Amino acid sequence: MSEDNGTINLEEFKNSFLKNYGGSAESVQLFSSPARINIIGEHIDYNGGKVFPAAIDRYMYFAIRKRADTKVIYNDLKFPGTFEFNINENFAYKKENDYANYLNGILSIIKKRGYKFDSGFEVLIDSTVPAGGGISSSSALECGFAYAVSELFGFGISRKDIALIGQQSEHEFMDVKCGIMDQYIIATAKKGTAELLDCEKIEHEYVPLEMGDSCFVVMNTKKKRLLSESKYNERREQCETALAQLKAAATPLPAGGKFSNTKDLPDLCSLTVEQFNAVSSILKDDVIMRRARHAVTENERVLKAVEVLQKGDLNELGKLLKEAHHSMQYDFEATGIELDTLAEAANAQEGCIGARMTGGGFGGCAIAIVKKDKADAFIENVQKIYTQKIGHDAGFFKCVPADGVSRI
């Protein structure tokens, strides 16, 4: 595996499959499924805003083949041990099944939706996606597996439904209440683009994202995100409080947005920045006001990002990333010393066009847009600063926008 481009040797991968399962190579089918980043648009999917993710060229790989019996067998080159099940069983979550739970969850939902399996199958998995790195290794696993199974058995499940099956499996099988962004971008992405995604309507538009002589660098804090769920819920409640207070005040709004009175607002992101500034004094609690201000300004940054990329202007996108980090740090207070150190160190480097934290915050990852010829020096310098300040290394890799789940 090459660290630089995140690909594997497919011939070796196929040979590993045959070593595990025997037989001949002709009926083995290969698939890939990418990781993802959210370029801009944090904590606004539940405030009526749009997100702006891209798939990246780090992949999960699947080699899969039908069997003559009803056995389902999983092997993963990154995790020891073989898991064996029967396609006709009622799959249930079991802690000891480890990563196999993600796969069984997908099979359980596919069966629930009425698809019939005429045999079992065997699968081998490999990956260049760092696990637990905040770039959706679990969604890449789920969607890639769902797509591979759908293709192998001729189910013809649409890309949108692949995403929805992944989300349904998280909700019903894994008991994780996730949004749709991760699965959706992984299932539907196109190389050289990002997606403006409306998570409420589940609709997207492709926006050109030609990197030219630049690339993304993903920077992983390697901080365990223990507090993230309770903090996430707290932030969500604060936004709901802000909306409730604005609606209760029933105040006229200046022109320019979709609504003329705060009482009619369905969500915070329906406000323009100008409208919000005109009524923000209704929010007496400074914390509540700042949480709402983040949602409104972040939504506007997403729309601006789309505008500047349609003109191919990466420099303007870089400025928006810096503003977005500042808003997450001071208005939303969802960064922490690790992410702030990475973003600050990154933005100070030569060749860095802009950097910000990405994902839910409180640990996880940051992203930077960096000139390709400066990327190695960038990584070295940021690593040095981070290690000195935080006391342990961060993880880094370079990437560019990539296709969604694919047959190889």
Each predicted region: which residue ranges?
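C-terminal nucleotide
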Residues: S2-R36, Y61, R65-E96, T193-P252, ...
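Short, charge-rich binding segments
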Residues: P53-A55, A63-K66, G114-Y115
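Gly/Ser-rich oxyanion-binding loop with an adjacent helix/lid
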Residues: M1-F31, N38-K50, E84-E89, E96-L209, ...
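FabD-like malonyl-/acyl-CoA
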Residues: S139-A140, C365-I369
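Short Gly/aromatic-enriched secondary-structure transition segments
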Residues: G48-A55, R235-R236
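Glycine-rich phosphate-binding loop
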Residues: F362
